[in-house]
Amino acid sequence: MSKEKIVLAYSGGLDTSIILKWLQTERNYDVVCFTADLGQGDEVEEARVKALNTGAVAAYALDLREEFVRDYVFPMMRSSALYEGYYLLGTSIARPLIAKKMVEIAEKEGAVAISHGATGKGNDQVRFEMSAYALKPDIVTVAPWRDWDFQGRADLEAFAREHGIPVPTTKKDPWSMDANMLHISYEGGPLEDPWTEPPTHMFKLTVNPEDAPSEAEYVEIEYVNGDPVSINGEQLSPAALLTKANEIAGRHGVGRIDLVENRFVGMKSRGVYETPGGTLLYHARRAVESLTLDREVLHQRDALGPKYAELVYNGFWFAPEREALQVYFDHVAKSVTGTARLKLYKGNCIVAGRKAERSLYDKDLVSFEAGGDYNQHDAGAFIKLNSLRMRVQKRVEDKGKK
């Protein structure tokens, strides 16, 4: 009798190799492995070969870099979303694409279930499984970290040795890392103390601001209909553009954030993030928007952005409310066409100029010189009418004191 198949999100590391063997031996599945290339820098073909050598019946390694940036990162950026005011959602936005590909592979392979290596305390388990259920409601999800009986790292390594899985002998960094084209996140180990400063050697994408060049660098980023299309006049594909933005901002130490965030599962956690290119694009986009978006549209968009960020963070990418908000943000983004010039210097990203063909900024209108559509004499009536409710409120309060 043939075994049922399960699709595993496989990184090639020790933990997912153990999960692969555990799914075979303890759950009696034929395991199909899937490794996504999201620009994390790992050798995905090596992971595919390792999966087959570890016992997978099939293994996929897919280059998703362009799709990731074009269909997930850039649409998210149109909202100017920041989770809790800081986080550019680098890990959160990668999970729905991985889940989507897992479901597609499951359908192709006739698999009945999917599995992942996310722990039972984090957000990723929610993001993977919510996305999968939204796309394939009857899919079975297996989360080994919630299910197995291993009590700690020693038990995991003993299981690995028992089944011929190589256990690294070199000492690992005491923190966990998750990387893709948009960012690298660091959690755990010494970072669990929110008073402890991250060690300088931890960072991979950005130089320490103190060690950045002593001369500022200027960069120009052009936007068309809400998305960046060129850097310093060079037209680039979405993935190539983000890669270049990472390189430019990273060498100036731009894009580090350190925050204590509220996880969807109910606890607070400390995360340290490097998002050099994303930070550069965020400031460039806002500079162009300051010229091209109507005041009320801009304020409304910014009011909706935190909700959108929350939906992405909590795993609701494929939910109808996120898709409805996306329609609004995409419509607003049609007005965001122009160029921003930014100055990068020792961890700082400073707007140094912006221009747009359809700019709403009217230099003549804001000039102190007379003329134009604005009559300063009208301002008195404008102020008086807008203060009416406060004047009424004050009169009522004064009457109550008598």
From Swiss-Prot:
Q: Which residues bind L-citrulline?
A: Y87, S92, N123, R127, S176, S185, E261, Y273
Gene Ontology MF annotations? argininosuccinate synthase activity; ATP binding
Query: Could you tell me which pathway this protein works in?
Result: Amino-acid biosynthesis; L-arginine biosynthesis; L-arginine from L-ornithine and carbamoyl phosphate: step 2/3
Which terms does the UniProt entry file under GO BP?
argininosuccinate metabolic process; L-arginine biosynthetic process; urea cycle
Compartment annotation: Cytoplasm
Q: Which GO terms describe its cellular component?
A: cytoplasm
Superkingdom per UniProt: Bacteria
Q: Which Pfam families match?
A: Arginosuc_syn_C, Arginosuc_synth
In this chain, ATP is annotated as bound at: A9, Y10, S11, G12, G13, L14, D15, T16, S17, A36, G117
Q: Which cysteines are joined by disulfide bonds?
A: none
EC number assigned by the record:
6.3.4.5
Q: Which SUPFAM superfamilies match?
A: Adenine nucleotide alpha hydrolases-like, Argininosuccinate synthetase, C-terminal domain
The cross-references to PROSITE patterns, in alphabetical order and at most eight, read:
ARGININOSUCCIN_SYN_1, ARGININOSUCCIN_SYN_2
Q: Which UniProt keywords apply?
A: Amino-acid biosynthesis, Arginine biosynthesis, ATP-binding, Cytoplasm, Ligase, Nucleotide-binding
Q: Which NCBIfam families match?
A: argG (TIGR00032), PRK00509.1 (NF001770)
Q: Which family does it belong to?
A: Belongs to the argininosuccinate synthase family. Type 1 subfamily.
Q: What is this protein called?
A: Argininosuccinate synthase
Instruction: Give me the gene this protein comes from.
Output: argG
